[in-house]
Design a protein with these regions (language model features):
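Extracellular "leader-to-stem" segments immediately downstream of a signal peptide or signal-anchor
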Residues: 2-78, 98, 143-145, 149-167, ...
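Hydrophobic alpha-helical scaffolding
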Residues: 177, 395-399, 603
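Short glycine/acidic-rich loop motifs that flank beta-strands on beta-rich extracellular proteins
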Residues: 74-80, 85, 105-112, 127-135, ...
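Feature marks extracellular polysaccharide-active and adherence modules
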Residues: 1, 20, 66, 71, ...
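Short, flexible coil/linker elements and helix-boundary hinge sites characteristic
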Residues: 30, 328, 417, 634-635, ...
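The right-handed parallel beta-helix/beta-solenoid scaffold, focusing on the short coil/turn
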Residues: 15, 43, 61-66, 85-86, ...
Length: 723
């Protein structure tokens, strides 16, 4: 049981774990020199320092800590003692922390070399480090997390210090969020207040690997350094619609001498100075606001700065250029568009442009990224199923088809008022289509995101549509306001018989929505031809959150006139098909990277309006994200908001095939990447219109990209044939 502190005047309520071990532990944050093979760099041998620190809760692959608070009753703000990490992800993938309050941890959560951590909807007071990330090689996510002294101070627990004395300590000693190497970290709605360093970004101890990341709605205040950037990898940091505020005498942002790459700010407010001692690189500011600086808003001693449509609150002392400054370019920036520069550089190239013809619409604010009320069945009634299944750490597959029994149980639950049908952990065989009735949820053992490797509740199938093939009904059909949660799906016969990894079996979509407000949450596709069909019916208000896996030809396709839907935290990567749980557990092992890169369309949007596409990622696809005319309604994509989308290893990372005059796609923090794919001679980050002078994309159709990053091996950066 757990309650959010901010909803209870800061009080810590519900389940509380009292930690009375580890006080003054000598190995509270120990590490040893070690070596590892980097799968992201051709298995190159790396040298690093691996944590061997003690920890209170060790989180291995496929684990979650949810709905509780953790408190150290013997900690004393007047005599602070170190304790081991409260939560520690050791290795592997998929460690989730959700609805957790760390009342007064010394060190909060450590993600050691691993993948796919997810910290969300949680609160932390940490006396040394709140969250620390090391060598995350597949998308880590931090979402809606608050780190502040107030959660201990206002907890109502015995021995809690005053907010003033606790803040004095954390501002002198503590770091809120510390990120070493992380490949494509997604950080959103992170709030940090009252720390010596709010966010620290930099290298791994012992070698030069650093992170790239995107930050959205990140707000830091009252810190000596709101954001401290030691170094960033060549792909850069994107920061949008955020704010960084300094304590008195501090810096809103500081760049250390090792910084030499790229950091992009868009729609960011700064309270206090930005200081850079970086050796080179580019720092760009677009639609930013600079305020509350006593000396200079920007003190740049080296490198390159770009200013676009930025406002400075003070009339002077906007930019100080140090001796080794290389370039300053400004467009429509300054106080009332008058930019004041104190130039001490040897030979910096300075270009100032003030002209209305270069004015543009700034990044939109207040974008909605999540649903107000999360979907759930209409009743609290839970029915636990007891069907034939395979269990254990072996390679056995289920042999009895439970389709009829499962459908009967779902129908009976509907008849009794709706609710949840719970499938305990194990592997179930479902070889005929089932329909989840309105108001009913089919739920497995997973309460958090998970990988094929983690086992749990799984539905295995050989269903391929029979004579109708891929056009037959879907295996799992969701009626209006029906959902599926916490289950893994596996198409057993995808490469059996006459089919192979080069030519896998075509099947219907595994899941189909057949009405409004359908939902799919924490579902993994271990292997399947097609994922979720939200295009054949109007599924307005649909909600998909953390669909992981490896669909081969189609991921999530949306259309049918749907309005107001959400697709969030999609995570597609071919390794879901080749990393199996202990003992194999009957899953087919398939390596499909080459096939998906030439055949998959991961995300497809047709006749939809007011769609929210948030923090999704696909590795390996022809089209990472694809917009086109609806085959059923004949209508075009409408207005959509896309925040934090990542396409990696794709032929075309973003493809607008069809669009009319009302199509408007707003994209923020996009990371669009091509790799050199065999048999794909033309590749580009963006393709708008498939052919030159195409009539399928209206000249007034809009694709608006704010704060984007592009890298890889394109033939052309962007191919714009219309719009």
């Amino acid at each position: 049981d757990w309650a959010a502190p901010e909803s209870n005047n800061g009080m810590v309520l519900g389940t509380i774990l009292e930690v009375r071990v580890g006080k003054n532990a000598p190995n509270y944050d120990g590490s040893v020199k070690s070596w590892w093979n980097d799968s992201q760099a051709g298995n190159a041998l790396r040298t690093t320092y691996t944590s061997i620190a003690d920890r209170f809760i060790e989180m291995n692959a496929g684990t979650g800590v949810t709905n509780l608070s953790i408190w150290y009753p013997e900690q004393n703000i007047n005599d602070v003692k170190p304790y081991p990490w409260t939560l520690f992800q050791t290795q592997g993938n998929c460690a989730t922390i959700e609805h957790v309050t760390l009342v007064n941890s010394y060190n909060g959560f450590n993600s050691a070399p691993s993948e796919l951590h997810y910290v969300l909807d949680s609160y932390i007071t940490a006396l040394n480090k709140g969250i620390e990330v090391h060598v995350c090689t597949d998308i880590g996510r931090i979402e809606n997390v608050s780190i502040s002294p107030e959660y201990w101070a206002k907890s109502g627990l015995p021995g809690a210090p005053t907010l003033a004395e606790l803040t004095a300590y954390t501002k002198a000693n503590s770091v809120g969020f510390q990120m070493h190497r992380s490949d494509w970290e997604y950080i959103s709605y992170l709030h940090i207040s009252g720390y010596k360093t709010g966010i620290w970004i930099g290298r791994e101890p012992g070698f030069a690997d650093a992170p790239n990341a995107q930050l959205y709605e990140v707000h830091v205040d009252n810190c000596e350094n709101g954001l401290y950037v030691e170094d960033v990898n060549p792909y850069g940091i994107l920061i949008s619609n955020s704010s960084f505020g300094a304590a008195k005498g501090g810096n809103a942002v500081y760049f250390y001498k090792d910084f030499s790459t790229s950091t992009q700010f868009n729609g960011v407010e700064f309270s206090g100075p930005i200081v850079s001692d970086g050796s080179d690189g580019v720092i760009s500011f677009e639609s930013c606001l600079f305020g509350k600086y006593s000396d200079y808003a920007l003190k740049i001693n080296n490198g390159n700065v770009l200013l676009s449509q930025c406002h400075f609150e003070n009339a002077d002392k906007h930019v100080y250029l140090g001796m080794n400054m290389r370039t300053l370019k400004s467009v429509n920036s300054g106080h009332k568009q008058r930019l004041k520069i104190n130039n001490h550089s040897n030979d910096a190239k300075i270009e100032i442009i003030t002209d209305k013809k270069y004015a543009f619409e700034p990044i939109p604010k207040g974008l909605k990224t999540n649903i107000i009320a999360h979907p759930r069945p209409v009743s609290n009634q839970v029915l636990k199923a007891d069907f034939s299944r395979a269990t254990g750490f072996n390679n056995q597959r289920p042999v009895k088809d439970i389709s009829s029994e499962l459908q009967s149980a779902l129908d009976a639950l509907k008849a009794s008022g709706g609710g949840t049908l719970y499938l305990p952990a194990g592997r179930y065989l479902v070889d005929k289509p089932i329909k989840i009735p309105s108001g009913v949820e089919l739920r497995g053992s997973w309460d958090v995101q998970h990988h094929t490797q983690n086992g749990g509740t799984a539905i295995f199938t050989n269903y391929d549509g029979g004579d109708a093939g891929e056009n037959a009904p879907s295996l799992i059909q969701l009626e209006t306001n029906a959902g599926i949660r916490g289950i893994t799906l596996a198409q057993l016969n995808i490469i059996s018989g006459e089919y192979s990894a080069e030519s896998p079996r075509k099947t219907p979509f595994l899941i189909q929505g057949q009405g409004p407000k359908v939902y799919v949450i924490n579902v993994t596709i271990a292997i399947g031809d097609k994922g979720i069909d939200l295009a054949s019916y109007d599924t307005s208000g649909h909600y998909v959150d953390y669909l992981g896996g490896v669909p081969l030809r189609a991921g999530i396709w949306v259309g049918g006139g749907a309005e107001g839907g959400f697709i969030r935290n999609m995570q597609f990567n071919p390794h879901y098909g080749s990393r199996l749980p202990e003992g194999g557990q009957g899953y087919p092992r398939v390596a499909m990277m080459r096939f998906v890169q030439s055949n998959c369309s991961a995300l497809k949007f047709a006749d939809v309006k007011n769609q929210t596409i948030f923090n999704n990622f696909v590795y390996g696809s022809v089209y990472g994200i694809h917009f086109l005319k609806d085959e059923i309604t004949g209508k075009y994509p409408g207005k959509m908001t896309m925040i934090g989308h990542g396409s990696d290893g794709c032929t075309y990372s973003l493809f607008v095939e069809d669009a009319d005059k009302d199509t408007k796609i707003i994209a923020v923090n996009s990371e669009l990447v091509n790799t050199k794919i065999p048999n794909e001679p033309v590749r580009s980050y963006v393709l708008m219109g498939k052919e030159m002078n195409t009539s399928k994309v209206h000249p007034d159709a809009k694709l608006i990209l704010y704060n984007s990053a592009f890298w890889g091996s394109p033939v052309f950066g962007a191919i714009i044939n219309s719009g």
